[in-house]
Amino acid sequence: MKNFTSFADAGDYKALLQQALEIKSNPYGYQHIGRNKTVGLIFFNPSLRTRLSSVKAAYNLGAQAWVLNAGADSWTLEMADGAVMNGGTQEHIKDAIAVMSQYCDVLGVRTFPTLKDKAEDYGEVVFNKILQYATVPVISLESATLHPLQSFADLITVAETKQKERVKVVLTWAPHVRALPQCVPNSFCDWFSEIDWVDFVITHPEGYELDPKFTKGARIEYDQKKALEGADYVQAKNWSSYRDYGQVLQNDPAWMLTPEHMALTDSAKFLHCLPVRRNVEVSDAVLDAPGSLIIQEAGNRTISMQTVLHELLK
């Protein structure tokens, strides 16, 4: 593993998953891997789980970690190549990332889409510049299109709780008060459509189809109730339209996940990446039910990051 930005970087996912489960069973047993190593973490947008779990993961491996909030804690960064920097920006991303690479052994970066320019967002312009200028391995802490550490944590959660060899996993769209990016659902599809013991179904209103390159191999069902029938795991998440980029085409509250929806499943466990708008995306009754795995899932964010750091630092 040279960098970690998508499912493709996981390589043999079964081996990586087994490593994660071993690390979870003995989280402090690999501190020789991180001894005298430093993990750099750069955030271009707010974070709770990613920030804290990444720091914890580094410490668990015996490494140190530093955190930088781009812009707030640093000079304002210029992204454009060949820019004449006579305006508000004070340091070029080319110089900043090269310098940060001097201060760490692996660099975690969190960027975010504008939801205004599909070509720019899906071209991963900012993240690719960081990959270009970094001289150490780079981990995606979320990018404009993907959130691989979250999806890896989801996979760990399903793997450690499943009660049968094959499971049906459903990703359902949910309403929200604002337009959200497609990073989490894209990544969930990127991972779960490739898992050979998962029957993967995506359900959403028409017009909310995700980028087909991430949904290949999945069954798409526009009838939410039909999709939920017999499910073993349900992941709820809002996203804005990919086709009509960044737009909220409709926000039907009937898509909010309730106990009535969950009753259609095979006593399914519930997943959500958090943060969640309670009683907008998902009802309290689902979030607080015994079958809700949201806290265990969040805890596994440490394990997913720790496993990736283990691979990159060993």
Label each residue range with its predicted role:
Residues 134-136, 197-198, 263-269:
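A short helix->loop->beta-strand "cap" motif at the edges of active sites that frequently abuts
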Residues 1-52, 56:
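Positively charged, low-complexity intrinsically disordered leader regions
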Residues 44-66, 159-237:
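Glycine-rich phosphate/diphosphate-binding loop of Rossmann-like nucleotide-binding domains
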Residues 33-39, 166-168, 267:
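Phosphate-coordination loops involved in phosphoryl transfer and adenosine-cofactor binding
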Residues 213-292:
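Rossmann-like adenosine-cofactor binding region
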Residues 288-314:
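C-terminal helix-to-coil terminal segments
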Residues 32-40, 47-159, 277:
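Phosphate/diphosphate ligand-binding glycine-rich loop within oxidoreductases
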